[in-house]
Amino acid sequence: WPSYERDVYEDGKLASNADDTDKGQLKGLIIARGNMVVDYTVVPVAPDSNDYDMSTEEGRTAYQQAYNEYAKQQEYYNTYVEPSAILSAMAGFDKLVNGIVERINGILCPEKTETRTNPYLNADGSEIQADTYIYNSVDKAVLYDRYGREVTGTDNGDGTYSYASGEKLYESAGGAAVTVDSYEYLMLDMDKTGYGMDDNKTVGTELFSRIGTDRYIKTTGDNGETIYLRNNLNETDYESLYKLGNLKINPEAAQNVGKIPLSTVQGKEDFDRAKELVDIWDEKFASLNPDMYAKSDYMSFYNNYIGEYATMGKALYNYVGNQTTMVDGYDNQRLQSEGVSSDEELEKMIKYQQAYNAASRYVNV
């Protein structure tokens, strides 16, 4: 509504019978369909206390910060995604696909994290994007990414704020870059990786790849050895995720299965890695949505996913049927008291026509 300078429907306001905001077919369709495209990243994942050193103040603080971030993500999900059956279905299915893809690729290409104070460089001297940029003490509560979007920092309690971002941050939209304190890089773990059966003993060949995106950037480490840094940018320099619409079977692996790293460095079959691939189907994967705390394996997750939306669809179908029956019943009652019967009206028209004709003949005579 341009004249009122407001939206016709407020996205963040839930439909409520008490507020009389649950009426209208168009509004119902918009809520069910949603107004955006979502993927697995909108599904919040609760932090696991086992991943933090809860015996130290630093560990407890880090866990609390992670949980606070999870609470914010959960609120967003419950407000904008969960009310839409289509959006929540999209996010849930993408989470399942991403979980399987990343787990299989992670076994074939085991990785480790390196934290350093200076970035790795390409052969041309350009900086290789890190997996995480760490800012420990910034005097601004809000910074900006390269698209001009606001990024809120974590209050350190001393007037400064800390940030952990997947890309560099800036003081203002289009402004100067903030000095990075440390860089975190994901890289292929050469101590744990498998090797291909080809002549080159290829490493780092994933089974599922992203469109227009290589998994690794090959460069040289500080000790002069070749390292493989995780690459998260596609050919157009945008972030590339393992999600629906951006996945394909790795052509390199499909055309030459010998490059799939399922052998040891001695050229023997890597039975331990093969067993690990088999065992992932029995691992606890994730919960279906943020309101469910119990985790399921992949098959149970899929069954729960199908069951939840089948039940929801059946309930909505029955609800629509009941509402239609009720409306038809009220309409029939209205017609009985105030409506017009076409047969009755036709009978009256014929009667009056015959009476008119008879009266006309009488006058003529």
Protein language model regions, located:
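Structural signature of extracellular appendage/secretion-system components
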Residues: 1-365
